[in-house]
């Protein structure tokens, strides 16, 4: 979902960076994902996310890692895409640091509160 945005940034030589949180840790959701979408490897890879079993634990590791990157890079805008815990952590980290947040896929709803993603969409 962010691949077209990344391609356009690259085409226009706009400064940007990609953070891979490791939330999806199978080979089909990692290196293959970047290859299939014709994306270069991400500049940043967080570790330890897959080691956490709970949503809270994963989100905490991502929040801490993303915050560290944002403090180092200080972008004017941080884009997130989707409804996974990665996006919740990224948006929260950026907002707490007074960095603008852009959300690709904002407004999508299922109204199924049994899904963790629905909670992330609303927050």
Predicted regions and their residues:
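Active-site and donor-binding regions of nucleotide-sugar-utilizing enzymes
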Residues: 1-10, 32-33, 45-123
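Non-catalytic terminal and connector segments of soluble metabolic enzymes
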Residues: 11-14, 39, 43
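Short internal beta-strands
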Residues: 15-23
């Amino acid at each position: 979902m962010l691949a077209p945005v990344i391609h356009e940034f690259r085409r226009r030589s706009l400064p940007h960076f990609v953070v891979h949180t490791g939330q999806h840790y199978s080979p089909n959701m990692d290196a293959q994902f970047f290859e299939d979408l014709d994306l270069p490897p991400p500049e940043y890879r967080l570790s330890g996310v897959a080691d956490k079993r709970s949503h809270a634990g994963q989100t905490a590791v991502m929040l801490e890692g993303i915050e560290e990157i944002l403090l180092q890079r200080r972008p004017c805008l941080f884009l997130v895409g989707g409804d996974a815990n990665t996006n919740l952590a990224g948006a929260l980290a950026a907002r707490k640091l007074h960095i603008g947040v852009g959300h690709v896929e904002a407004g999508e709803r299922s109204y199924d509160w049994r899904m963790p993603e629905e909670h992330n969409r609303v927050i």
